[in-house]
Amino acid sequence: MRIIVIAVGRLKQGPERELAERYRERFESLGRKLGFRGLDIVELPESRHADATGRIAEEANAIAAHIPEHAAVVALSERGDNLDSATLARHLGRWRDDSVPCAVFLIGGADGLSAELSRVAKIRLAFGKATWPHQIVRILLLEQIYRAGTILAGHPYHRA
């Protein structure tokens, strides 16, 4: 199973990009041993539409164009569920075992994701009740994906 993170906005060169890349590389190395076929990050430009409704719609169209058929979609949302790391690992492991071709994680722009993208998601995931910058959310997500891999592998990184 392939994992894809589709994110509106780009991480500029610097410590945030380096940390995100470190977690992506760690998961790729570990994931191959667990039956995962990689972790891709798709960065999409932020909409320049004048109003929030237009920005959300433009970004939703761009995101939807990158979601493969039969993917398990996870939408990051401040109104989502707070899952613990073990639960996220169970979802990824189950999808892998059920031969789901890929899991796609969606990170919207500053105005959030469209209602339609939220509806098609199997899971709406939040990282607490706080509002996070999109750059930090991407790092948190990549760390949690790596942590899920370590849980599935029985690796001591996760000490719950």
UniProtKB/Swiss-Prot annotation:
Catalytic class of the enzyme: transferase
Keyword Cytoplasm: yes
GO CC terms in record: cytoplasm
Molecular-function annotations in GO: rRNA (pseudouridine-N3-)-methyltransferase activity
Localization per record: Cytoplasm
Entry annotated with the keyword S-adenosyl-L-methionine: yes
Enzyme Commission code: 2.1.1.177
Pfam families in the cross-refs: SPOUT_MTase
NCBIfam families hit by this protein: PRK00103.2-3, PRK00103.2-5
Protein role: Specifically methylates the pseudouridine at position 1915 (m3Psi1915) in 23S rRNA.
Subunit structure: Homodimer.
Family classification: Belongs to the RNA methyltransferase RlmH family.
Protein name from the UniProt record: Ribosomal RNA large subunit methyltransferase H
Organism (species): Afipia carboxidovorans (strain ATCC 49405 / DSM 1227 / KCTC 32145 / OM5) (Oligotropha carboxidovorans)
